[in-house]
Amino acid sequence: MESKAFNKPKVELHVHLDGSIKPETIIHFAKKRQIKLPADTVEGLLEHVSYKEPLSLTEFLSKFNHYMPAIAGDREAIKRIAYEFVEMKAKEGVIYVEVRYSPHFLANSKVEPIPWGQKEGDITPDEVVDLVNQGLRKGEKAFNIKARSILCCMRHMPSWSTEVVELCKKYQNDTVVAIDLAGDESLNCESYPGHRKAYEEAVKCGIHRTVHAGEVGPSSVVKEAVEVLKAERIGHGYHTTEDPNLYKELLEKNMHFEVCPWSSYLTGACHPDFTKHPATQFRKDKANYSLNTDDPLIFGSTLDVDYSIAAKHMGFTEEEFKRVNINAAKSSFLPESEKKELLYKLYEAYGMILSTGL
């Protein structure tokens, strides 16, 4: 078997729960709930939901329609996908992960419109967060890693954002550590002030903030994320480099970029030649960034795929991988005391702690 590109403990900060579901679990709940899937075998299902050559972001987003109806609105399914997510990450050598999701996309009650063509049920976005928390906590105990969550606002649904920030407040440090904004980057916050208001409330209440920006959208979306939404981290951020002044400013601020190499190839976010990927620029400039999978189910990937791409095509060394993970830990949304513990674990695993030799 090919050896892993980086066989040491890792930290992952940008991965979507609803893009990380085991195909077997989708098939199980589709059968149980009598929901029709495009195929009823793992191989058949993956032919519809997974892909290996670049598609547009719209085509990528359509993949969720194939399987989310089997999971959304089912208590057992929601708990199980959170638990199995922790199991999956533990197997990849991750010791700390922040997983993100939209509570509204898994609900079927008190959500307008009800997603995925579901009939109205009795699972509210609030209960979704509680169910995910239960699954994550159970997974933490079983697999001995730390998992926290980030709740997503959706750019096309600003009416949900107030509730998202309220749920962040309610479950703050009960696995939930931050708020995110995901979706179509062309929908800006001037036209959709609901997001800005939610982020203002997050700032006021000490809730950490990340924003998907500059993935397929221009550098102006990154500028808005930093200046208007007061983002502490940027999801993707590849197109930041197109505005040299903004890029220089964010380097000086030590802004963290959540980089997803394989994802950026498959969504057409970046040039298909990895040697021209913004992450190579980030590496050369000693920027603050991490390596992440984004949506492993749809991209047919594990964290090792992203690390292998970085090693083979972007000139990454073991030392750079260590630096990337230390930066990820430093930029995590954990409370300071837990962050120190996490960093100590990494320093120890990377042989960076000098023995006192009694």
Swiss-Prot record:
Catalysed conversion reaction: adenosine + H2O + H(+) = inosine + NH4(+); 2'-deoxyadenosine + H2O + H(+) = 2'-deoxyinosine + NH4(+)
Gene label: ada
Binding note for cofactor: Binds 1 zinc ion per subunit.
Cofactor(s) essential for the protein: Zn(2+)
Binding site for substrate: 16, 18, 183, 295
Active site location: 215
Binding site for Zn(2+): 14, 16, 212, 294
Lineage of origin: Eukaryota, Metazoa, Chordata, Craniata, Vertebrata
Keyword Membrane recorded: yes
Organism of provenance: Xenopus tropicalis
Protein name: Adenosine deaminase
Function description: Catalyzes the hydrolytic deamination of adenosine and 2-deoxyadenosine. Plays an important role in purine metabolism and in adenosine homeostasis. Modulates signaling by extracellular adenosine, and so contributes indirectly to cellular signaling events. May act as a positive regulator of T-cell coactivation.
